[in-house]
Amino acid sequence: DLTRKQTIGEVVSYLKSQTSYADALKDINIRHVHRGQIEDCLNQEYYHRCAKLMKYSPKSDEDFYLFEIIGVEINLIMDKLVSLQAKEQYSFNLSIPTYLAKKTSFNIDWLVNIESFKDLLQYLSKTRYYKVLKEIDFSVPFDVKEVHMCLQSLYYENIVETIKKHFKGSVQKDLLNILYTSIELKNISKIYRYKQYFHESEDSIRSSLFLQYSRLPKDMMNRLISASGPKEVLSLLSTSKYNFYMDDKEFAYIEYYADSIQYNIAKRYMRFSNSAPLVYMTYSILQRIEIDNLKHIVEGIRYNQPVSKIENT
């Protein structure tokens, strides 16, 4: 139904009247609505849903259940770095539940008043992010993608370390399997995107991936990276364990299949597991996929994309 709506206002009206997103979108005026406003509300709803489950997590395993906070903090730090480099000031438009806000490693609101890289480093000097940021020369223009890559690597390292610290046996194995699969699917999608749109060198592609978490054989990853183009990437994937069986379609289509694989894996674990950490991780994945799907629909309608294309994103 949603993909066949004609305007963003119609999408919001449907979500308000027919779904559990009514409360999240209650303050949006359907006659004067823009995509960014909806995305902010959907992101807030995601964190609220996760926070509801976090409240019941064992105190001893709290580090694991709060892994989403690291992602929030990294996004805010990156936003601040970009604004400082562009010499622009703006207010952050992210609202997270009070329960989560109390668990952050720094006061999010205070970031707004920071006016220099020096002040930012000083402010974050007691956090896990300092060891990454202190290595960057902010006296010259920096590579935003490289900085984000370093912080994202820190994010994954922290989750892996936390899982190994708090869980053992099959629970640890299953949690790592879900995480590594998620990272690998992102790697695969990124390789395809580079081949389809940017024609980057093999070294450039390799440096943008988190290969330390790959579950595909090393030879397969090397062949994907060195593929002559998107068609060869798809051909190689059709012989892998993921078995995409895709013909030559645009990137949104491969991303759709990557999300489908992650969705089915998460759904299976949630259905058959009685392990609280597994249920929480899979729940957060399923919620994120649902939120992202809604964002894709809004974006597709905003740019007047065909229904068939929206449905394959």
Residue ranges and their predicted role:
Residues 1-313:
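N-terminal domain-start signal
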